[in-house]
Amino acid sequence: MKPRNRRIALIVAGLSALGIATALVLNAFQSNLVFFFTPSQVSAGEAPLERTFRVGGMVERGSLKRQRGELAVQFVITDTVKAIPVTYSGILPDLFSEGKGVVVQGRLDSAGLFRAEEVLAKHDENYMPPEAQHALDEVQKKPASRKP
């Protein structure tokens, strides 16, 4: 093989390898990409069916239903305009409660029910873990001792 043909073959092989590597990386990004939607966007049909995405909003008051003795839970997420029903099987975060912010990740089925695989409770910037709050409360209850 002539040096020129060998050089062309190496360039073609290198470009092919680069193209394949780029395609694999883009495919990995595409499969791990999780979009965020509001309940209004989900109700309007903007969210994909049978594909993982996130929905954020408030847990509607009075919508939380638990099965006795099971981890299954149903609730409704709203953005004050539209609401979507959610079902989840697992342990809910400690901060999860009605009227509070939540982000759920999962899939929307053809019946319009969001089947959550993960539930994340949102909190405000003033949140403090209960242990830390208790420690601060105890310190504030003790009389301040002054040094001379």
Swiss-Prot record:
Q: Which SUPFAM superfamilies match?
A: Heme chaperone CcmE
**Which HAMAP family does this entry report, sorted A to Z?**
CcmE
Topologically, how does it sit relative to the membrane? Single-pass type II membrane protein
Principal location = membrane
Matching InterPro entries = CcmE (IPR004329), CcmE-like_sf (IPR036127), NA-bd_OB-fold (IPR012340)
Q: Name one GO biological process term.
A: cytochrome complex assembly
Q: What does this protein do?
A: Heme chaperone required for the biogenesis of c-type cytochromes. Transiently binds heme delivered by CcmC and transfers the heme to apo-cytochromes in a process facilitated by CcmF and CcmH.
The family classification in the record reads: Belongs to the CcmE/CycJ family.
Which species does the entry assign this protein to? Pseudomonas aeruginosa
Topological domains on the Cytoplasmic side lie at 1-7
Statement: the UniProt record of this protein carries the keyword Metal-binding: yes
Query: What are the protein's UniProt keywords?
Result: Cell inner membrane, Cell membrane, Cytochrome c-type biogenesis, Heme, Iron, Membrane, Metal-binding, Signal-anchor, Transmembrane, Transmembrane helix
Write out the transmembrane intervals: 8-28
Lineage of source species = Bacteria, Pseudomonadati, Pseudomonadota, Gammaproteobacteria, Pseudomonadales
Q: Which gene encodes it?
A: ccmE
Protein name, UniProt field: Cytochrome c-type biogenesis protein CcmE
Q: Which GO terms describe its cellular component?
A: plasma membrane
